[in-house]
Amino acid sequence: MSSLSIPRQSLYYVNKVTEGRSVSNVQVVSPCQKQGQTYVTAFTPLTSNVQVHTSLEQLSTIRNADVLIFNNALSQIITNADLLTDFLKNATNATAIGGTVIIREDLKDCSDKRQVARLTDYFDVFRTTDSDGNNTGLDLYTVDQVEHSNYVEQNFLDFIFVFRKKVFAPTTDATITFRDFLDKTQYTNTGIDAYEWMFGVNFISPGGYDENLKIIKRFGDFKPGQTMLDIGVGIGGGARQVADEFGVHVHGIDLSSNMLAIALERLHEEKDSRVKYSITDALVYQFEDNSFDYVFSRDCIQHIPDTEKLFSRIYKALKPGGKVLITMYGKGYGEQSDKFKTYVAQRAYFLKNLKEIADIANKTGFVNVQTENMTPRFKEILLEERGHLEQNEAEFMSKFTQRERDSLISGWTDKLGYIEKDNHNWNFFLAQKPFPK
């Protein structure tokens, strides 16, 4: 598989984020002068004004950069919160509002192999007041793996963080962004570990490996080398399963940096270049048109507020004849209890029923639309998994606390109650992008 050079991969993101806006001031901070010059060459078609700096100390001299790039410049400060804060303040102040900030950092030698989650969180929630009194920060576009490192060096922990400087409304909320909300509520590190114990190794969705394989096979025949986008890839079990079982190349995305840090650590151990991951929002990332044979999502899109926009983006990303398969939490047709409404609000879910999903799919232009209420199977799985915990409580308690145990038992029991009242459904959706007439 071919890969872009690191500077050209950076240029690719700049073109995506700027969406054609003019760029006249590109600043590069690279301790390695030779590597810094490769950015000059790559960005020359965009602008002749590309300046290279070899020290973070020079950052304070930069202002109004349209593009600010850091190439392996943070290795001495990434574990020091005070120095990181100073860096982010200087980087934000050096960038024009609407400008692009790209941070390339190779984390393979970090003792903490999940350092990417810590940095993503730190960068994503940082805010500072500029000279005009604006509350500014870095709006996350994506955290991607460096393609050259993946394919040439088998290093899966070399990253490019891509942000756009933005003015944010002041907030006193405990969670600053939706990614921050996910990682501090449902997908804490302990929460993820407990989910994985319940669902099975590498999975945090109902039924684990076997159920996922059964669902995946409903796509039909796969051919080695075909491509799949996995939205809400979690800790990566489904992506690696499709690559292992069918030879499909998978681009897995998730907004939870905690979950993807686990997926990335395991991918680095396994060295499977058929799989790559991005920490990003499916409603933000600019996928290439007509680029995937399949789009897959397991129990994720209930987190996404705009289903119409999501389906439109999936449609554009699929090749003609490509298929999309989604399982999702949905709402039933029974009168919703107050307890269920509270649960939905706490999880920040945006639930649809089967008819609403089918209507959106048809309106988007999909054909061969199939929907199915899989709630009876969901009930079976919930009973099996709750029973697994009750029968193996000693093992669970050797790894987790009483609080985690009680939370899982009550969560599974509550879902069974929601199912009985036809509040909570588990829905299946399969459709195809038509071939041109």
Swiss-Prot record:
N-methylethanolamine phosphate binds at Q186, Y187, Y195, Y329, Y343, R347, A348, Y349, K415. Feedback inhibition by phosphatidylcholine and also by S-adenosylhomocysteine. It comes from the Eukaryota. Pfam families: Methyltransf_11 (PF08241), PMT2_N (PF17987). Pathway: Phospholipid metabolism; phosphatidylcholine biosynthesis; phosphocholine from phosphoethanolamine. InterPro entries: Methyltransf_11 (IPR013216), PMT2_N (IPR040516), SAM-dependent_MTases_sf (IPR029063). GO terms for biological process: methylation; phosphatidylcholine biosynthetic process. Disruption phenotype: Essential in multiple developmental steps, its disruption causes developmentally impaired worms. S-adenosyl-L-homocysteine binds at I204, S205, G232, D254, D281, A282, R298. It catalyses: N-methylethanolamine phosphate + S-adenosyl-L-methionine = N,N-dimethylethanolamine phosphate + S-adenosyl-L-homocysteine + H(+); N,N-dimethylethanolamine phosphate + S-adenosyl-L-methionine = phosphocholine + S-adenosyl-L-homocysteine + H(+). One of its GO terms (molecular function) is phosphatidyl-N-methylethanolamine N-methyltransferase activity. Keywords: Lipid biosynthesis, Lipid metabolism, Methyltransferase, Phospholipid biosynthesis, Phospholipid metabolism, S-adenosyl-L-methionine, Transferase. Belongs to the class I-like SAM-binding methyltransferase superfamily. PANTHER family: PHOSPHOETHANOLAMINE METHYLTRANSFERASE, PHOSPHOETHANOLAMINE METHYLTRANSFERASE ISOFORM X1. Catalyzes the last two methylation reactions in the synthesis of phosphocholine, by converting phospho-monomethylethanolamine (N-methylethanolamine phosphate) into phospho-dimethylethanolamine (N,N-dimethylethanolamine phosphate) and the latter into phosphocholine. Phosphocholine is a precursor for phosphatidylcholine, a major component in membranes and a precursor itself in the production of glycoconjugates secreted by parasitic nematodes to avoid host immune responses. This is Phosphoethanolamine N-methyltransferase 2. It comes from Caenorhabditis elegans.
